[in-house]
Structures are given as C-alpha cells and as structure tokens.
Amino acid sequence: MKALKASIRVAVTALALSLSFAAPSHAEEDEAGALTRQMKQLYRAGKYTEALPLAQKSLALREKEFGPDDANVAMPLNDLGTIQYNLGQYAVAEPLYKRALAIREKTLGADHAEVAMVLNNLGDLYRAEERYAEAEPLLKRSIAIGEKTNDPSMVLALSNLGAVYSNQGRYDQAVPLFKRGLAVLEKALGPDDPEATVLMNNLADAYINRHRYADAERLLKRSIAVTEKAFGPDHPDVAQAQNNLAALYARQGRNAEAERLFKRSAAAMEKTLGPNHPDLAGVLENLAGLYRDQGRYADAQQTLKRSMAIRAKTRPI
C-alpha cells in the first residue's frame, strides 16, 4: 500500500508581500487585492477549482500593470503554480514556478527568503513527479537559505526533503527532518494548528515503513481530527490522512476498516479535487490492492482500470 506523501507548498499565505514593491493604479490594486483575499480563503478550504480563475485573473492584472518580468508578478505566478499543482496539473505548474524563481533571483538576489519559497515549491513539484535527483538540490538550497536568514518557514523545505527521502525508502534520513519540522511548527503555532498536520502525515508514513504502527496510527488520527475541526470532513488534507490510515490498517490485516477509509478518502478527493486528480488515482490503487489481497479480483480490476485512466490523463508529457 502506498501512503500519499503530504507536502507543504507556499501559496496565498504570503500574497501580501507582492503588494509592497510598487504603487499600481488604485482601481487595479483594489481588484487584485479583492481577488487575493478570495483566493486565500478558497485555497485554505481546499477549493482549488474555484480558486483557479481568481489566481489567473490576479496574474493577468499584475502583468498588465507591471509587465511580465516585474517583481510584482512573481507572487501571482507562484500562487497560480501552486493551485495548478494542487489540481494535478504539474506540467502547467512547472513553468509558472520557473518564471517566479527567475524573477525573484533577478530582483531580490539568490539568497532571499522569497527565493527559498519558490525553490521549495518547485522542488516539491519534482518530488510529486518522482524527479528526485532534481528535487533534492532545490530543497537543500531552500533549507540553506532559511538557515542563513534564520527564517522559520524553512520548515516547508524540511518537510518536503523528508518526503523525497521517504519516497525513496531513505527513512533514516527522512524521520529527523520530519521531527525537526514538526517541533518548529508546534512551537510556533501550537499543537493543534492544521498547518502541522502535513508533517504529522509524513512522519506517520515514515513510521509505518519502519513498522512503528502504534506511533503512526496516533499521528494520523490526530491529523484527521485537527483538519476536520479546522476545515470540515471533505478537505483534501483529511482525505489524504484517511488514505494513509487506511494503508496502515491494510498492512495490519484490518481490511474492513481499511476499505471504509479508502472509500471515504476517494469520495472526498473526487468531490473537492475532481475525478481526474493524481491523488485520487493513488487512493484507487491502494483500494485495488486491498481487493486483490482479499481475492476480490473483479473489484480490483475495475478499480485499477479507473486509476490507470486517471494516470493516463495526468501523466507528465
């Protein structure tokens, strides 16, 4: 069973930074600001499809006002890239991140915290595409900038580098990164802040693969409870943690519990992310594996066929 590696990507949480570089006309500034606020709310609620046109319009306004390579355009590029990433549109997200990175390096210098932000996001995109050799140096560079500038947001890259290692079975390297990141977030935000649940999921997955099942179950249940309280039962992060908990139950032979959670996870992902998202394909693959292990071959074949159809639509070209 595959657990879905959670990841942290900076998007609308830092949008206000882009407003300080210049003084655009009041009409367009007001419109862009309103779009930004709406997009932030939708993004945090996991409503990425609804956030997408707002991000696209915000970017268009910035480009019209400042030109395509101005510093004010970098944040809208980054945010649109992150929303496309969350929609599974990796090939669309990559050039947006690369443009944002080039602008920030040119205007802010190579060691600025906002450069580290985009390095993290691009590195995590490569992780999602299993381009680990490209992801690792970007995430390490992001961490190095954070350490140099004493920026606590380096926890983002710590988590995602840990996910790169975990995806490759390098759990002894992943666990310390997850623990370090989780400690930083809990100290800064408190033990029940939903921002910390991403690291809970990643650390739990590493524990599963090291056969520390009780520790993993505790973290995943906590992650589900915190995220449901903050965002409701259909949020993508809830679905992701449910998938991971189901994978744990499947390993333990708790098949009925695993099937129930896989189905809940798939239903929530389809509702919030759409029927063709890569994360949904991952849950369906896990459910198909559970069916196969129980000798339910017709169910397994039907479920796997659906997953393969999603993969064919979303696989990078």
Q: What is each PLM-predicted segment?
A:
Residues M1-I317:
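Intrinsic-disorder-linked linear interaction elements in eukaryotic regulatory proteins
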